Amino acid sequence: MPENRGYLPEGLSAPPLYTLEMLRRAVSNGAVLEGTVQRCDGDLNLYLQLGSTFAKIPREEVTAPWISGADREIAVLSRVGKQVCFTVESLSADAKGAPTALLSRRKVQEQAMEEMRRGLKPGAVVVGKVVRMEPFGAFVDIGRGIVALLPTEYISAARIRHPNERFRVGQKILAVVKVFDRENRRITLTHKELLGTWLENASRFSEEDTVRGTVRGVMDYGCFVELAPNLSGLTDQREDLREGDGVSVTIRSIRPERMKIKLQVIEVLPPAEPPETLPYWITDGVLDRWIYSPANCERPPVVTEFTEIP
């Protein structure tokens, strides 16, 4: 099981049809619930409909206090139409006697962050949900709406220019905590360590196999073609290939001692969409060290060390 199993990302399951009795119990026991935000007003208050109960999350209760400035406004506005977690702080009735609820998402996030600060460490495998992507990285909800950054360079061993070449918004993924700045409550993730070593990936292929790949780099000396997210090979230089092209290639040689795979392009194909699920070789636990390179490789080893910030 992932190390954050006690506080999962928002929106992984559909919220129930709430009754007033369910909300009364939640006031008493402090249960964490989820619902879909219907509206955000000009003061950045959020509104939800929980069965017959009209609910409000005041702006000061929408996000954790360590999120401020423009980031805070974006964090609030981006919740409209999406599920959020909350506790039910109180129940009352409006002027017409209809039930209303006052909610807090901030309290849930503060509790989750304290659990993370106590128990989550570098190397921990976590489940996450991709909530936004930029060229420099993917923003991933790793529990109760707490967002960590997964830099593009850490997504896979095969190079990509943008996270959308590997993920889609809303996708459930696994990741590894790379850096946890507990003082500033900032978490950086990595991902490639879960996608298998060079040998693990290369073992799926044999010389003279013809397989589909994606062009990831066009150089003067050849083109890099991704065979798997953590494995690429090199073809001869071709002027008709562009990054992102799909190709069929024949594997001419596999050389573990040099971490090299020689390919020959057979045909140019339409680009492929990112898969719904990724081929994870590791799905839980805490990593201390991960070595991508084969043991007998003549090149300097590619290693990830997981250590705490001093």
Regions found by a protein language model. Name each.
Residues M1-P310:
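Single-stranded RNA-binding regions, centering on S1/OB-family and related RNA-binding modules
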